[in-house]
Amino acid sequence: MCPCCGAEYKSIVKFNLMDKEKERLFSEFSPVSTENWKNKIVEDLKGADYDKKMIWRTSEGFNVNPFYRKEDIPSGCGAEKPGEFPYTRGTKSDNNWLVRQDIDLPSAQEANARARKILGEGVDSLAFKVKGKLVTPEYIPALLEGIDAEKVELNFNVCVGKVVDFTHLLVEYLRQCGFNLEKVRGSIGYDPIAKEMLAGKNLDNYTEVIKALVEATSALPQYRCIAVNSCKLNNAGAYITQELGYALAWGNEYLNAATEAGVPVDAVAKNIKFNMGISSNFFMEIAKFRAARMLWAKIVEQYSPECKCACKMALHAETSEFNLTLFDAYVNMLRTQTEAMSAAIAGVDSITVTPYDAVYEAPTDFALRIAKNQQLILKHESHLGKVTDPAGGSYYIESLTASIAAEAWKLFLAVEEEGGFRKAVKEGKVQAAVEEAGNSRRTALARRKEILLGTNQYPNFSELSGGKRPLEKGCGCGCNNEAPAAATLSIRRLGEEFEQLRIATEASGKRPKAFMLTIGNLAMRQARAQFSCNFLATAGYEVIDNLGFKSVEEGVAAAMEAKADIVVLCSSDDEYAEYAVPAFKAIGDKAIFIVAGAPACSEELKAAGIENFIHVRVNVLETLKALNAKLGI
């Protein structure tokens, strides 16, 4: 039993182990060595290079093998039970995470009405955004009227300039209402480094604020007043190991600064909450959260806390905004569903699912309901809340956990050796590194090495934006409006440039027609027409596919009759030498002529004046921008 929090950890499942003398299943199969498995793969590759074909070189800095065996798991990795140090498998013996929903409304009365409504629909954690001008003695009673603070987690994102005032008002309100302060749960998300990173502000007094907050919340043992919002890095496009490595350095910055200022390490560690993002990389995100708990526990352990439970990471997870899209927005539900599932399997403490329409509007009641139900399905239909660390013991997940931990630890040490996280932020190093990662991913998207369904691949051909435009998000607190004193973190969604391209096409008032001149080999012309339709529709063009033409002349005549702005010749590589030049000459300057593919005769075609080719190796975004320019868009 923990002397500080009174928690007692026991395994909630009893296993009846098979007697060694009993017959084992599949005993007729002899063991297969790793070498034999690899030899079989090499044989099936029929001469292809094993490393190039089968080993995934991740952006996170390590390789992923095609198969894993017991010997791939580092010694001792995941050997503890859930709820045991270093908490790789979870900080508790169950997996009953909290379903959180954010509330950002202009008045206390509106926010209260929303909160009371969703609390009756399965939500058990609320997050209120509180602007500085709202921090008054009257605000909190109006905001929390009718809400039992002992039964729901209450989280507040408060203006940094008003956070201490707000905290005193909150504690006083809870006392006056007669709540058992030891049962009240929640957080007050004071994260000065995030403010410095996002707005370029200078908050040199933050250690004094932390001391004041820790003292103010001392009567609330289950409240956390310091936040590490590494979800901001995720939303800016950071790699998984970047987010984790920086998050650890971020938390350690607060831990070190506060303890040096005289705050006991237990008090500081138990007041830090990590708010991390969840990317769409399903298995790696499971591993990231497991690695996060383990590494943070070992960091806190170095400060020699009196209580082991100070080493537990309080971990909230938010689905990523980086990969959300304006077009085909319902696909956002699928993205956030798999993200929420990975966090649930990883055993985080609470989850926020971003509503599918958050990119372009204040979420509707329908979108909020779906976002909440996405978690409830995982809990009550998939029963993930009944299973603790189901990924534990998986050779793949355990190996990923170790690999991500190793790379994140390297980054953590590098930041510490150069003076700590805040120094790196003040010098713009963190912002630059994350910007580089985000740009790398945008380049991958432009080349379709990374896919956003409905944006750069398989767009909805008939969809129009309907006036939807990306929402501009800001702090909105009204404090510290001076110009940034340092570099700021650029948060841009992955698909923004494709969306801008498509919106520009719509705004031009003319929707270009792209005509597929399909001829020759049936299989190749169909494949290339499908590729070209998807390629050009991502810019919002109207695409006209065809079954096939008997001659170039017939195809060109049909294209002219359709008033095509673009004509795409779709055939086989061997036949382009025959069809391309006659088609190009017949079309002349009546339309833009494109060859679908990169045939061996490309140089001859270029010599004849053909300059537009689309294929899997081109930069889709730059090609479409160039076409828009030629079309006067």
Outline where the language-model segments fall.
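Glycine-rich anion/phosphate-binding loop at the beta-strand->alpha-helix junction
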Residues: 248-251, 275-363, 370-371
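Catalytic alpha/beta active-site cores
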Residues: 15-281, 312-316, 344, 350, ...
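A glycine-rich phosphate-binding loop feature that marks nucleotide/adenosyl-phosphate handling sites
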Residues: 55-63, 189-193, 229-235, 269-279, ...
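Mobile "lid/hinge" segments at catalytic clefts and subdomain interfaces of large enzymes
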Residues: 221-258, 334-412
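Conserved, mostly hydrophobic/aromatic
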Residues: 61, 122, 178, 296, ...
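Short glycine/threonine-rich loop-to-helix capping motif typified by GTGT followed
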Residues: 238-244, 279-291, 320-333, 361-371, ...
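Intrinsic disorder at enzyme termini
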Residues: 19-35, 53-56, 62-87, 349, ...
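Short, Lys/Arg-enriched N-terminal segments with co-localized hydrophobic residues
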Residues: 3, 8-17
